[in-house]
Each structure stands twice: as C-alpha cells, then as structure tokens.
C-alpha cells in the first residue's frame, strides 16, 4: 500500500498534498479555515446540484419552484437551507482565513495570496448571483441595484448594464444567465483552489511566528488530518444547528415575497456578508466614486505585500500592529452594521467615518506603525 501511495501517478499527488506533506509543527487552529473552506465548497456544490434538479430559471416559475423544493421534494427543505446557510458559513470561514493571512503575514507568499483574491471575487460573484435565483423581492431589487452600478463606468456603462441584463431591465434573460453562471462558477472556483494549493505547496505553510520552520516539520497525516476532522465536526454542528433551529436567521423576510418590479422594498440591502462593502459604496455621494471604493475595498488586499514595512513577518511579536489589526476588525463589524441601516442621520456620518478609517488603517497607519516598531527593535 505504501508503494502504491508513493508511486502511483494519482496517489502520489494526493500523498504529497495531504499525507506526507511536511507541515510546521506549531500552526494553530487559525490554519484550519483553509480545509473548512474546502468542506464548505463541497457542501455548496453537492446541495446546489440537487437544488438545480428541481429549480426552474424562469421569472414565472422560479419563486414557486423554490417553494416546491421546500414543500414537495423529499428533504428539499434541508437541502435548500443547507445551501443558503452554507453560503454564510463559507463567508465566515473566508473572512477568518483572510484575517489570519493579514495577521500572520501570509500575504508575503504573493502568488498564493493573489490567487486567493481572485477566489474571493469569484465566491462573491457566485453568492450574489445565487441570491438572485429565488426571485423574491430582495433578489430582484438587489440584482437591479448592484448591476446598475456598472452604469457609472464612463461611456460604455449604460450599454454594459443592458448587455448584462439581456434587455432594458432585470428580467427572464437576466435570471437565466445568472443561473448558468451560478452553476458553472463553483467548478471554476474548485479549479482555482487547486492552483491556490499548488502555489502554497511550492513554499510550504507559514506559521504563527512567521519564522522559517524548515528545521521543525511534521507530516500532515495523522497530525493535521485529525485536527481538520475536529474542525469539520464543529463547522457541521454549527451549520446544522443554524439550519434546524433558525434557518431564516440570516436571510431577509422580503425575499419571501415574490419579485414585483412595481413595488420597491423600503430598504434594499444585500446578504449580511456583503454589508461592509455596501456601506463603503453608500458612504461616497458620487456614483462612480462609490463603485471605485467598493471594488478597492477588496482589491486593496492585492497591495498588502507592498505595504509590508516591518522587519518581522507575523504580528505575533508586534503589539502596536496587533492593536491596529483589531481596530480594523472592529471597523469592519461597524461597516457591516451600518450597511444594514437606512440612509439617514447618524448612520450616514458613521458609515463615512468607518469607510475613511478602513482605508486609512490599511494604507497609512499599519505601514507607519510597522516602521515605528522597527525603530523600537533597536532600543
């Protein structure tokens, strides 16, 4: 069996990736989220496949087909809610995974980091299109508002929006193409994950200290397979608790009303995991400026390796940087809260201040703080 594991062309790849992989001996539970994201992707693809068997991407029947899945299909309700809440779990793991990367300086592996940013954009696009499919009020108006943002692009904006819509408004053509893209994107994401892992295994994993750990490696199996299995157990427990006890906790009640182009909901807002970016978008009065800020709020991650001015890789031994990191986390939570509030005083000014602080922290305060810490090292 050992010979087959080490010599068979396919088994050899699996062996080098998940069994005999030399791994730092001191990586903490923060390194569990990569495998948890793999689990989330698997859950989403499997549940999505079963939902696609019963869903119809037509404006007249989409809403009732989702109702049919929940009422008439065997265990359809649990498949539907596993898929909807699985997306929330996916984003929780994503945010923690990215946060871990920022805290421990994993962004210095620039190829792995950049593929990760592409993955983040792809998952966000997939989730947005998935939210449109049930064809409820928030699905329709969310699709209208978010796609309309592209009209802010000079010269080609209006034509681009109508090209995406497949007409002069969000309608049957839009829903059909969103379903097609929502179906194919997870497989593209799975392929990107392979590339992400390929680049990661070129360098090996980072560790909490940020120090090269070549002298102290252990095999991935059994140590980290067991550790990942515990993570799987905890995540599935949390997901099933959410699905079985309060499946609609993270959803919007407006989405239980069929889409009506003649009736606008009082507060149009996306799913909770997009609220921080939505708050940044709304904080700028100019349409094009808002769209740029929205894109930059994620794309700013790409310049993080360039903003790394510290002599140390990790924040483990940098208390001032740690403080700024947790201020950034608090700021993102504030933006998430603001994104769900109506556009009125005092939420407008809080959103503007939080958006300004977000960019200030990443672009100015954290790099300057790292330089100060470099000076303190000499004392």
Swiss-Prot record:
**Which InterPro entries does UniProt cross-reference here?**
Cyt_b/b6_C, Cyt_b/b6_C_sf, Cyt_b/b6_N, Cytb/b6-like_sf, Cytochrome_b, Cytochrome_b_C_euk/bac, Cytochrome_b_N_euk/bac, Di-haem_cyt_TM
Q: Which GO terms describe its molecular function?
A: metal ion binding; ubiquinol-cytochrome-c reductase activity
Q: Write down any Gene Ontology CC term.
A: mitochondrial inner membrane
Q: Which residues bind a ubiquinone?
A: 201
Cofactor stoichiometry and binding remark:
Binds 2 heme b groups non-covalently.
Q: Where in the cell is it found?
A: Mitochondrion inner membrane
GO BP term, pick one: mitochondrial electron transport, ubiquinol to cytochrome c
Question: What membrane topology does the UniProt entry give?
Answer: Multi-pass membrane protein
Its domain of life? Eukaryota
- Write out the similarity annotation: Belongs to the cytochrome b family.
Quaternary structure (record): The cytochrome bc1 complex contains 11 subunits: 3 respiratory subunits (MT-CYB, CYC1 and UQCRFS1), 2 core proteins (UQCRC1 and UQCRC2) and 6 low-molecular weight proteins (UQCRH/QCR6, UQCRB/QCR7, UQCRQ/QCR8, UQCR10/QCR9, UQCR11/QCR10 and a cleavage product of UQCRFS1). This cytochrome bc1 complex then forms a dimer.
State the remark under miscellaneous: Heme 1 (or BL or b562) is low-potential and absorbs at about 562 nm, and heme 2 (or BH or b566) is high-potential and absorbs at about 566 nm.
- Protein name per Swiss-Prot or TrEMBL: Cytochrome b
Source species, please?
Ochotona princeps
């Amino acid at each position: 069996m050992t010979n087959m594991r080490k010599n068979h062309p396919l088994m050899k790849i699996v062996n080098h990736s998940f069994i005999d992989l030399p791994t730092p001996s001191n990586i903490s539970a923060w390194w569990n989220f990569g495998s948890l994201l793999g689990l989330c992707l698997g859950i989403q693809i499997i549940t999505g496949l079963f939902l696609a068997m019963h869903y119809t991407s037509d404006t007249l029947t989409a809403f009732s087909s989702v109702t049919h899945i929940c009422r008439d299909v065997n265990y359809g309700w649990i498949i539907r809610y596993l898929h909807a809440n699985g997306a929330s779990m996916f984003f929780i793991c994503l945010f923690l995974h990215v946060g871990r990367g920022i805290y421990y300086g994993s962004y210095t592996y620039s190829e792995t980091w950049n593929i990760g940013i592409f993955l983040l954009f792809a998952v966000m696009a997939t989730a947005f299109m998935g939210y449109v499919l049930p064809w409820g009020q928030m699905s329709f108006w969310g699709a209208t508002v978010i796609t309309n943002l592209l009209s802010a692009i000079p010269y080609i904006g209006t034509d681009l929006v109508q090209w995406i819509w497949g007409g002069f408004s969000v309608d049957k053509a839009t829903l059909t193409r969103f379903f097609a893209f929502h179906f194919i994107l997870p497989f593209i994401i799975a392929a990107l994950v392979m590339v992400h892992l390929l680049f990661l295994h070129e360098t090996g994993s980072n560790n909490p200290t940020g120090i090269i750990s070549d002298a102290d490696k252990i095999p991935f199996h059994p140590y980290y397979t067991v550790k990942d299995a515990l993570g799987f157990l905890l995540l599935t427990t949390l997901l099933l608790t959410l699905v079985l006890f309060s499946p609609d906790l993270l959803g919007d009640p407006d989405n239980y009303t069929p889409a009506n182009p003649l009736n606008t909901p009082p507060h149009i807002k996306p799913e909770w995991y997009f609220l921080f970016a939505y708050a940044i978008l709304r904080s700028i009065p100019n349409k094009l400026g808002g769209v740029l800020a929205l894109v930059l709020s994620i794309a700013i991650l790409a310049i993080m390796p360039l903003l790394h001015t510290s002599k140390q890789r990790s924040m483990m031994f940098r208390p001032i940087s740690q403080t700024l990191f947790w201020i950034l986390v608090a700021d993102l939570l504030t933006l998430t809260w603001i994104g769900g509030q109506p556009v009125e005083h005092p939420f407008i000014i809080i959103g503007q201040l939080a958006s300004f602080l977000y960019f200030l922290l990443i672009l100015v305060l954290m790099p300057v703080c790292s330089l100060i810490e470099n000076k303190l090292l000499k004392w």
